[in-house]
Amino acid sequence: MAGRLVILVLRAYQRFVSPLFPPSCRFTPSCSQYAVEAVERYGPLKGGAMAAWRVLRCHPFSRGGVDPVR
């Protein structure tokens, strides 16, 4: 149940907020898509922690690249 709510919030962000800003994520998939996939696969606690760690690694000095949910 909590996982569905988290995914709903992430999808709302992807649909309504993200298009207002230029693309800036250095990773593929984007950080918000990574968060959706992590929560779907591991649940809101572990998936949320994985997503938070990913966002912390997404900064101008990061090399970025392909980083799928594993």
From Swiss-Prot:
Chief location: membrane
Compartments, record wording: Cell membrane
Keyword terms of this UniProt record: Cell membrane, Membrane
A Pfam family: YidD
Keyword Cell membrane: yes
Function noted in UniProt: Could be involved in insertion of integral membrane proteins into the membrane.
Family indicated by similarity: Belongs to the UPF0161 family.
HAMAP family named in the record: UPF0161_YidD
Name used for this protein in its record: Putative membrane protein insertion efficiency factor
Upper lineage: Bacteria, Bacillati, Actinomycetota, Rubrobacteria, Rubrobacterales
